[in-house]
Amino acid sequence: MLTVHFVLAYYSLHINCGGKRVTANGNTTFEEDASEAGPSTFTRSRTNWGLSSTGHFLDNSIKTDAYIQTNTSRLLMSDSQLYTTARLSSISLTYYGFCLGNGNYTVNLHFAEILFTDDKNFSSFGKRIFDVYIQVTNI
C-alpha cells in the first residue's frame, strides 16, 4: 500500500478578529472569527489558523462573560467592517498560523479601541501591552 501525504502551504493569513468573513482592501478576504469561544479554549478554523484564549472577566458588572465586543458607533474610515468587532480575553489571547510556507512576509496588525464609550477612553485605563511572536521570535 502506498501512502501519500499532501502538504498544503499557505502564503497569507487574514483574520477579522471577532467578526464575520469580509472582503476588504479591494480583494483581500479576512476569515471569520465569530465563534463565542469561552474563557479557556482552543479553536481551530476551517483553514490554516487557530486561537487560544484564557481568563474570566471578574471585575466587571456583566453577569456573563462576553468574548466578542461590537462597536455601535458610526465608523467613517474605509473598510470599517474590519473595525466593528473585537475578540476579548482577560489574560491571554493567541492566534496561530498553520502551514505557512517558508518565505518573507509583511505583517500588518490593525487595532481599534471599540470598548470604551462616553467620556472614557483607552488613555484613562492605562497602556495596552502585547507581544508578537513569529517563528518563536518576539518581534
Language-model features and meaning:
Residues M1-I139:
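Compositionally biased, intrinsically disordered or flexible polar/acidic segments
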